[in-house]
Amino acid sequence: MASIPATVATVAQANMVAPFTGLKANAAFPVTKKVNDFSTLPSNGGRVQCMKVWPPLGKKKYETLSYLPDLTEVQLAKEVDYLLRNKWVPCLEFELEHGFVYRENARSPGYYDGRYWTMWKLPMFGCTDSAQVMKELQECKKEYPQAWIRIIGFDNVRQVQCISFIASKPGGF
């Protein structure tokens, strides 16, 4: 006589989960529980209604901060102070014909747009005061009043340009 194994069907319960049998969760990584209090988080919800979108048609793109109104002398000095605090070397460059983005020497898309600007004098190695940079900016504006002038900051350790912004534009731009 052959024996046939009996199978017993049980109903699976969806809410039953096997217990965790490994390491204790808090044994290696102590965790402090924090209360989720969202009342102290910053919010600009009230200001969103008054924001505007920069119109993309008919507007020339320059460098960093070019979407803003022209920077005042005080604002430019603060940007230069930031550059100097980061131990970057200030340098002035100017362009007489094309201060805006266009492609001449490179056709590939991306950050590099193929423009070459003329350096005003030499990079200001050892500069510690924004007034020195502002004096050079005034000299460059006097020599080339119809030029785009930008201030750039080089990191001479990493050998990269870290900041670049338009300091002066010709009239009508």
Swiss-Prot record:
GO terms for molecular function: ribulose-bisphosphate carboxylase activity. Its main location: plastid. Keywords: Calvin cycle, Carbon dioxide fixation, Chloroplast, Photorespiration, Photosynthesis, Plastid, Transit peptide. Pfam families: RbcS (PF12338), RuBisCO_small (PF00101). The keyword Ion transport does not apply. It is found in: Plastid, Chloroplast. GO terms for biological process: photorespiration; reductive pentose-phosphate cycle. Residues 1-49 form a transit peptide. One of its GO terms (cellular component) is chloroplast. The basic functional RuBisCO is composed of a large chain homodimer in a 'head-to-tail' conformation. In form I RuBisCO this homodimer is arranged in a barrel-like tetramer with the small subunits forming a tetrameric 'cap' on each end of the 'barrel'. Heterohexadecamer of 8 large and 8 small subunits. Belongs to the RuBisCO small chain family. PANTHER family: RIBULOSE BISPHOSPHATE CARBOXYLASE SMALL CHAIN 1, CHLOROPLASTIC, RIBULOSE BISPHOSPHATE CARBOXYLASE SMALL SUBUNIT 1A, CHLOROPLASTIC-RELATED. RuBisCO catalyzes two reactions: the carboxylation of D-ribulose 1,5-bisphosphate, the primary event in carbon dioxide fixation, as well as the oxidative fragmentation of the pentose substrate. Both reactions occur simultaneously and in competition at the same active site. Although the small subunit is not catalytic it is essential for maximal activity. This is Ribulose bisphosphate carboxylase small subunit, chloroplastic 1. It comes from Flaveria pringlei.
